Amino acid sequence: MIGILNRWRQFGRRYFWPHLLLGMVAASLGLPTSLNDSQDITSLPNSSSSVSRQNNVSLSLTDLVALKEAHRRSSYSVDYWHQHAIRTVIRHLSFALTTPQTVNAQQADELEPHSLVLLDTLNALLTQDSQYPLVISPRAGRVTFYPQAHHQVGIWLAQIRGIRAGPSLLS
């Protein structure tokens, strides 16, 4: 009985949890939709240079770059488990980039741009600063920066909407 439990634990540690984390990162980045919408790389004509294949990979990954730069939600930030999943994917991809010597150079060149762009995007997700909301005041015509203004609803109403309750001067 103990042997069965130990084997199940080893299976979970080696196979189940890494694949679950990879799936979480892929689902959060939208990888299945962005890569399935592009042409199949193997259906491209085989040329002496892999320029056409590299162009196709870079075109299919433009959605990832746009997703990285997009402002999804004002309170969007990567939480601990998301960071853990992204770090696991980066680790798996970095091990996958170290190709064995038996693989020829052309196959390694075809896989490298896709993996490098994906690593760069995941690293940017980990190192990005959380984006705070910027409010443009219609009266003053200037951009006002509010760091963590979630608990300052009264101040926001007073400055932006002109609704005031309490003293006219904030000390």
From Swiss-Prot:
Specify the domain of life of the species encoding this protein: Bacteria
Localization per record? Cytoplasm, Cytosol; Periplasm
Task: Please indicate if the UniProt record lists Membrane as a keyword.
Answer: no
**GO molecular function term, any single one:** translation regulator activity
Q: Which InterPro entries match?
A: SecM (IPR009502)
What are the GO cellular component annotations? cytosol; periplasmic space
User: Record's family?
Assistant: Belongs to the SecM family.
Q: Name the chain's protein.
A: Secretion monitor
